């Protein structure tokens, strides 16, 4: 169909305004990559005032109910841990059972960010607004990552790839104030120490036996005394496994870190 001169003029103006091809212009919506990183007061990896949050999500499936549960629990925890804190870095990895691959969430890559108000150097209202924009944007990015993840049910519930992946992230951004949020229901179909033949007959004793088996075989990555909060325990599409899920979380938590706690979240 032949386009009118007016339509061509409008298209050209739109492309010029974007300084990129028209197709690329559509992708330049809200971008969280620069929020909090332009300030001369941005925190560094050696800044003890900066908090480093590492989010690890072992997603059992990507139904909307599961995604909503994960997003609500994770962000309630992040907001609680960063309440009143304006200098921090957020790192997030998602594992869905695809080999050992962990997907890093856009704008949650460990970049140090500062939303600190400094009199005479920046605007307090803008700092607060950008901090909120950053959280809102990363929340959407995380939701999109979870919704588009491809799952391998044969290895679901194996959170260990996330723990191994997190070690490098913790080292890179270690400020002395690192907190790890691990979301998993621990209901694994693994073939090694995590193999659970009859989860329906699970018990605290069996959960402890499985966790110890992994530890004895040196198949359980540990995080020393890093602050670790476990979410997702008791969650599953099979409600009969809820109790065993919680028992597994408790058994593994105390072996992952000496400073680990299990929380149901909200």
Task: Map each language-model feature to its residues.
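Bacterial N-terminal signal peptides that target proteins for export
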Residues: 1-10
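Bacterial N-terminal signal peptides
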Residues: 11-20
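Bacterial signal peptide processing site
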Residues: 20, 26-28
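Von Willebrand factor
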Residues: 48-175, 179-181
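P/S/T/G-enriched low-complexity
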Residues: 51, 230-266
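Catalytic metal-binding/acid-base residues of hydrolase active sites
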Residues: 60, 186-187
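VWA/integrin I-like adhesion module and closely mimicked acidic/polar interface patches used
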Residues: 187-242
